[in-house]
Amino acid sequence: MFRLYDTATSEVRELRLRTPGKVGIYLCGPTVYGPPHLGHGRATLVYDILRRYLEWTGLEVRLVSNITDIDDKIIDRANRESRPWQEITHKCENVWFEAMGKLNVRRPTDVPHATEYVEQMVDMIATLIERGNAYVTDDGVYLSVPNVPDYGLLAHQSLDDMLSGGGDREVFGAGNKRHPADFALWKFSKPGEPSWASPWGDGRPGWHSECVVMSLSILGEGFDLHCGGMDLKFPHHENERAQAVALGREFANHWMHNGFVVDTEGEKMSKSLGNVANLLDLLEHYDPRAYRLVLLQTHYRSPVRIGQDNIDAAVNTLGGLDSFAARSQHLVGSVADTDVITRFRETMDDDLDTPSATALLFETVRRANAALDANDPLAGGLVAAVRSMCEAFGLDLKQASSVPADVLDRAAALDAARAAKDFATADALRAALQADGWIVETNKAGTTVRR
């Protein structure tokens, strides 16, 4: 039974599927106005791992992740640079998917663009007005938040508590709103801005209206899981859900949010704070798998600090895994060790506990190396288990090695000597490899040799 923390209920509970054997997931995608940062990378990697694991267990996953291709930030950049807004969104979307490809993030099943669903958004807003849950002002159309009785479910605050605390409320149209928490469903356009026709005047949809329409249009009511970063919980996801409630439509059954990427001071990285680390820089200078491995070693709900130390450590660990893959590539056809796979499923089924599952992976690599050293027939099952876990993680191993077999054998002998606490032999083997021009690095996955 797969269990996940549900933001709405504040508990780890079973992910109950609307249709047995099938999972419908909506992930809020990027607003394409600039390069992706590490926070974007974390969100897409977390949910890529989730998707891969669910498919690994035999479920059919439909992952919908949108592209917000019309937004105030896009318009602002277009105006600053005197460029067509479509040129900016097209280029930034291409950069986004190029980065996701390098991270080995699989393309979502569906990639809806907000501009493709404007007609449906207009229809939804019209329905909200007809139901008395939205109203027209001089600058747009707003949802009447007090008409949503359980507003604040995801934030775990009542509307009164939000207002008394200041809250993170929408500034747009502050002078025209009936209530401070009301938010824009439709924004009337200014001269020169992109716009679409509506019964109330030309304009564009509000951000919160885009995702609720796309998710319900593609996945339908009562879809299984809505995902995104912790920063989207409020107000974006709260406001998405509020519109569905105001429409009288069932929305997501389960809510999942990943933690922040923080800087060295523990501060959340964001563009508004000016401490964003560009994901493209990381991908240019490091093995892209290193970021995935660092995130696997951190629980998805916990904050993660990304620095040169933990990226370097991940690169070294990957080297050990690659050496193991090269050493064991001759073993084919074995069935994965049942005990290992059972333990793996137990940890992953418990709120996607990738840190424990990753520890199990390294433990299995060590056991497999020892079995290979001893020509133990159990080696095949352990090797197959390692491959299976890496498949579920989306962690590709570089099995084609440029390291000669005799060098790999000497590295394995070094590991065997260390395991036997025969450090004199281990040191001698290390010195001999170094004398032959090899860089020798040892970590918890074993010894890596490279030029």
Please state what every model-predicted region is.
Residues 55, 129, 434:
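Anion (oxyanion) recognition and catalysis
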Residues 1-33, 48, 97-98, 119-329:
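Alpha-helical recognition segments enriched in aromatics with Gly/Pro capping
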Residues 107, 137-138, 442-446:
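Short Gly/Ser/Thr- and Asp/Glu-enriched loop/turn motifs at secondary-structure junctions
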Residues 9-14, 18-106, 449:
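N-terminal, positively charged nucleic-acid-binding surface of large information/translation enzymes
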Residues 59, 133, 438:
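Short phosphate-binding/catalytic loops that engage adenosine nucleotides
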Residues 267-270, 275-451:
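Structural preference for alpha-helix termini/caps and helix-kink/transition segments
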Residues 108-116:
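Phosphate-binding beta-loop-alpha motif at adenosine-nucleotide cofactor sites
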